Amino acid sequence: MTLRTITLIAGPTASGKSELALQMAQEKNALIINADSMQVYDVLNILTARPREADTAIVPHYLYGHVSPTLNYSVGQWLCDVEKLLVTFTSRSVIFVGGTGLYFRALLEGISKIPHVPDVVRQKWRLLLNKEGAESLYRQLLQIDAVVAEKISSQDGQRIVRALEVYDATGEKLSWWQKQKTTPLIAPSRAEKILLMRPRALLYERIHKRLDSMIERGVLEEVVAMKKLMLSPSLPVMKAIGIPEFMAYLDGYRSFENALEAAKTQTRRYAKRQMTWFRHQFDEEWMLTS
């Protein structure tokens, strides 16, 4: 019996990951699983550059557009969905493709088993943050969990509060919980790992062309559909690049040209952050290709 192959394809936005995955999936008779935290959401088909119907008709694609934009979909939920697929398709070769580095890390290393923090505890620490300020709470964190405190800025109120609320709710330091990881779904030695990194000038050109193409394909209709849902700005889907920019255009605060240029600028910045993250976080086992 031939063992199935596991392939991971990571890279910055607009680098051509989906095209490479489709090509390899046909060669390996594999299915494709999404590893991009924005492509999981429904409605934003064009804006998040999900695979087109012509591609999904050729090769089965999973975990694309299966989550309501009203939800906050976590890496833990993604791992649960992945595990179900791996159990269902035990003998089928699989290709994971996407630009969310944390998804790949969780897949290969597991994730910390941090318990749910009750809303009353979370609210307590957020009120204290507003009342006392980040630096005051940071001094408390230094006394409670110096390991975590030394990794974050004394001005980073959100991360300071997160560490304090976990300790308050569980009696254990966040640094302790971070070591209690789930068993990885995939052993790193079992996977072929590909990091697709285009030359920066070429990548930026691809980004610009893709956004122009999105306009032609009707991306503004998706933004209108999102606007009608009247979602909280704090939801992850509302932070997708293009949503704030094009909503500002629809509301009359930006010209169309300005909104499009802003979306291109934000996408370039995002791609640069992705490239930096991949270079620092992925080891030499990832095969670099352009």
Swiss-Prot record:
InterPro entries: Dimethylallyltransferase (IPR039657), IPT (IPR018022), P-loop_NTPase (IPR027417). The keyword tRNA processing applies. Gene3D superfamilies: 1.10.20.140, P-loop containing nucleotide triphosphate hydrolases. It catalyses: adenosine(37) in tRNA + dimethylallyl diphosphate = N(6)-dimethylallyladenosine(37) in tRNA + diphosphate. Its EC number is 2.5.1.75. It comes from the Bacteria. ATP binds at G11, P12, T13, A14, S15, G16, K17, S18. Substrate binds at T13, A14, S15, G16, K17, S18. It is an enzyme of class 2 (transferase). The record marks T100, R122 as: Interaction with substrate tRNA. It holds the Pfam family IPPT. SUPFAM superfamilies: P-loop containing nucleoside triphosphate hydrolases. Keywords: ATP-binding, Magnesium, Nucleotide-binding, Transferase, tRNA processing. Its cofactor is Mg(2+). GO terms for biological process: tRNA modification. GO terms for molecular function: ATP binding; tRNA dimethylallyltransferase activity. Residues 36-39, 158-162 are annotated as: Interaction with substrate tRNA. The keyword Magnesium applies. Catalyzes the transfer of a dimethylallyl group onto the adenine at position 37 in tRNAs that read codons beginning with uridine, leading to the formation of N6-(dimethylallyl)adenosine (i(6)A). PANTHER family: TRNA DIMETHYLALLYLTRANSFERASE. Belongs to the IPP transferase family. Monomer. This is tRNA dimethylallyltransferase. The lineage of its organism: Bacteria, Pseudomonadati, Pseudomonadota, Alphaproteobacteria, Hyphomicrobiales.
